[in-house]
Structures are given as C-alpha cells and as structure tokens.
Amino acid sequence: MAFDFKKEFKEFYMPKNKPEIVNVPKANYIAVRGKGNPNEEGGAYQQAISILYAVAYTLKMSYKTDYKIKGFFEYVVPPLEGFWWQDDVVGVDYTNKSAFNWISVIRLPDFISKADFDWAIETATKKKKIDCSSAEYLTIDEGLCVQIMHIGSFDNEPATVDLMDTYIEQNGYVNDINKDRLHHEIYMSDARKAAPEKWKTVIRHPIKKA
C-alpha cells in the first residue's frame, strides 16, 4: 500500500470544521511563485499548477526509470497547497483576485533530496514538454498555527477566518501573519469535480502568544 500523507498525518490534512491549534513541523515542498487571479484561464496560476504536478509525478514514478532515489518508497502525491497574500492590504480583499501573490506547493517526502529534485526538473521539462525551471525546492517551517476545515466556496472564507480569529483571541493567541508566515490553504477536494458548496479546504494561520 502506497504511503498517503493525508492518512498518516491526519492532524494536518483532516482537521475538524472548528478551529484547533497545531504545531506544524518543517517539511520540503515543490514550489512555484507568482501573482495574479487564480481563476484566469491559462493564467500564471494554472501554469504553475501544471508545473507542480509535472515535477511531482516525475518524482513519484522515478522508480520505473533508471534513476534511483535513495530510501524511496511508493507514495500518493500529496494535495495541492497554497500560501497567499496581497501587498499593501490590511487583511484580504477577496474581490480583487488579480492582486493576489501566491506560492503554490506540493509536499515532498523526506527522502527526496535537492539532487533528486533537480533531476526531476530536467526530466519533466524534457519528457512533458513543459518548462519546469520556475519550480524551486522550498523548506517551510510553519510552527505554531491555528487551522480549520473550511467547507464551501473560497469566496466564503472570511466567515471561517472570523471563527479562527475569535478562537485564538479566547485562547490567548494573536495572528502572526507577516512576510515570512502566510495565510495557508490545503485543497482537499478536486474543484473540477465537486460542487463549490462541498469543497473542503484546510485554512491555516500562523499564531503566537498574545
């Protein structure tokens, strides 16, 4: 049975639909940075997603090639995730999607080294005929956070974020969102197949003691 991050680390991928505090360990990711409306057809965000999956599946299927990754075991590609922010905006203006900056990521198993990653970039670019050079090997140490499972459209996130803010205030914490610690989403539903009102998205915010 292939290793599945969603099942092995349920506390980070399947929170309840009420806020909870977690300490998220350091992990490595495939990452692509960009700016702009994520809904733009053929836009930068959709191109980034194509690059992420091209690299992710090249690594996942590497055991069927001559390239051998030390310590490799079969695994399920983890869910798509995203870190989001807007310049010069207090909070988030969900109506101005073109102002979003983002880092789109997919988690890597710990056995994937930078050398393995570089091999995958070169291989995916060559075999899948897509330029993957914008992908980077990124280590993220999130630390102390509040998270919740948001169910519904992304446009309805503000009400869920309000629940998170109230919860941390009641428990002696404050938001610690800054240029290094960002609004984080993990997409647990396939938006192409599920109705928006059924989308499941983990929302995670960095916090610190008040």
Map each language-model feature to its residues:
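A solvent-exposed interaction/effector surface
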Residues: 1-210
